[in-house]
UniProtKB/Swiss-Prot annotation:
<keyword id="KW-0808">Transferase</keyword>
<dbReference type="InterPro" id="IPR017441">
    <property type="entry name" value="Protein_kinase_ATP_BS"/>
</dbReference>
<keyword id="KW-0418">Kinase</keyword>
<dbReference type="Pfam" id="PF00069">
    <property type="entry name" value="Pkinase"/>
</dbReference>
<keyword id="KW-0460">Magnesium</keyword>
<keyword id="KW-0539">Nucleus</keyword>
<dbReference type="GO" id="GO:0005524">
    <property type="term" value="F:ATP binding"/>
</dbReference>
<keyword id="KW-0547">Nucleotide-binding</keyword>
<dbReference type="InterPro" id="IPR000719">
    <property type="entry name" value="Prot_kinase_dom"/>
</dbReference>
<dbReference type="GO" id="GO:0106310">
    <property type="term" value="F:protein serine kinase activity"/>
</dbReference>
<feature type="domain" description="Protein kinase">
    <location>
        <begin position="21"/>
        <end position="309"/>
    </location>
</feature>
<feature type="binding site">
    <location>
        <begin position="27"/>
        <end position="35"/>
    </location>
    <ligand>
        <name>ATP</name>
    </ligand>
</feature>
<dbReference type="InterPro" id="IPR011009">
    <property type="entry name" value="Kinase-like_dom_sf"/>
</dbReference>
<comment type="similarity">
    <text>Belongs to the protein kinase superfamily. Ser/Thr protein kinase family. MAP kinase subfamily.</text>
</comment>
<dbReference type="InterPro" id="IPR003527">
    <property type="entry name" value="MAP_kinase_CS"/>
</dbReference>
<dbReference type="InterPro" id="IPR050117">
    <property type="entry name" value="MAP_kinase"/>
</dbReference>
<comment type="function">
    <text>Mitogen-activated protein kinase (MAPK) that plays a role in conidiation and regulation of secondary metabolite biosynthesis. Acts as a repressor of dihydroxynaphthalene (DHN)-melanin production.</text>
</comment>
Amino acid sequence: MVQQPPQGGSRKISFNVSEQYEIQDVIGEGAYGVVCSAIHKPSGQKVAIKKITPFDHSMFCLRTLREMKLLRYFNHENIISILDIQRPRNYESFNEVYLIQELMETDMHRVIRTQDLSDDHCQYFIYQTLRALKAMHSANVLHRDLKPSNLLLNANCDLKVCDFGLARSAASTDDNSGFMTEYVATRWYRAPEIMLTFKEYTKAIDVWSVGCILAEMLSGKPLFPGKDYHHQLTLILDVLGTPTMEDYYGIKSRRAREYIRSLPFKKKIPFKALFPKSNELALDLLEKLLAFNPAKRITVEEALRHPYLEPYHDPDDEPTAPPIPEGFFDFDKNKDALSKEQLKTLIYEEIMR
């Protein structure tokens, strides 16, 4: 049944979903999708329905496929789940994907913009983010696009990580050469190694993003709001200071090393000077999350055990997930060889399985 949410403006949005759902309001729009709130009439449950029209671009198809496969794979309190996927009538008429998900009231980006967060809030939100990340990393999955708008929240302060469209396997044997072409993740939360070398990306890139999010929660504004690639690195080094010799030689790319060497020497700014009102333990964790050298950055498990998160840490209630099976990301390895039609078939098969 085709339904149209009430909307201002001239653009019409129609949702072709089962009569079990009553569409209510548009709650979000992205490059290739619209999210509406709805009611599942048989149960009275409020849900979010994400309508995706990915078939114009291979990249959107790949993101949709990753999102569906991974959200179905994880079953975790702090990762958004797919309650249902609308099954198309047939392949011929299949040109939209409808994901039915839990309805969350807001996201971290909106919350940070509209209110000051207490230290308790910061603790609880970072704890839940790391709890989700522990499951992802134990499954050998990198999220790669952690940022405040991808942390969904409800009135209970429950947090769920969403948007797995850029995720990939940490055990990936390819050289990540396609990584940057598709890597449109928000620059502000990108780890320095992503800009300084094109070879190895590890779980530490997600840990860096968590550090950027914690800093933003503490101050209410982004820590490294770079305008472009060079500006981004400059902002990072303005705070962290010029890398030590050991960290400098840890950078794989010679070109990247030469670029760093060409920059003026900078002294580190203590986080206490940037966040004078913040809890000392929060700043100690921040220091460890935002280590310039990925090899020295704290792991998710270590971060969960950090004294700042002690009020919430419970080793018996921080579940891991099984490693993703061999072949789970095969479509990604062959992505350049797959036509849009082949990708559409893969998405159709994933929905119908």
